[in-house]
Amino acid sequence: MQHNNDFNAAIKSAARQLGIEKPRASVPAVDMSRLLENAGKEPKPSKKTDAEPKSIIPETPNLLLAPAGMVGTIVQHILATSHQPQPELAVAAALCLCATVLGRRVATSTGLRTNLQIIGVAKTAAGKEHARKINKDILLASRSSEFIGGEEIASGQGLVSRVAAHPVSLFQIDEFGLFLQAVQNPNAGSHKAEIVNNFIKMFSAATSIYYGTEYADQRTRPRVDIPHPCVVLYGTTTPETFFPALGSAHVASGYLNRM
């Protein structure tokens, strides 16, 4: 090299050629010896100082996971017989079962009924099925199978027909997120979209009367009216399918705040 390995001289020479020999501001000298000594060496792993990220969802208070009375008895049975106990799901299922049994029998001073709509969200293979199974077992053992609604609903009119025959019905729908996506699909027929609409209407009509659809042929297709329908929904789903299925339309329609 022209400067006999003198890097400072080389830099000054290059600066003169580029017209930047004199800096606009003073620059303090930098000791590069430590950097050159460590060149080529493997860096030591840095100590982890950041705290583990915390969930933004608060833990459920223990008091809410151990209710009293019949709800608590059902919760304890669900947990005691489960391979993967899920207290939150057990409470949700027990509430829906008791809400069904009490359907059209009790009301608050403001007219509220027991037509609950609860969605249990848990990861895949987290044991969502067990609580639904216990609900069915209890209703079957108590000879109350008439309360059990279908696990799939083909159309809005199918929902109306079921509730007209059994005004108190418990619908337990697995993969509820996929169900929402299916009924919202633009390629789905109007009979699918009517399912959610009828859930909303029957929820609101629990304190009065649900008035069905008027058809042109009143003789063969009369209007179906249902006094105080008690439609209880217990859906289970995974976060991956449920949250993408929610949108502003559910807020605008009022369906989201009914869950």
Language-model features and meaning:
Residues 1-47:
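Short, small/acidic-rich helices and loops at N termini and domain boundaries
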Residues 30-258:
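Phosphate-handling catalytic cores of nucleic-acid transaction enzymes
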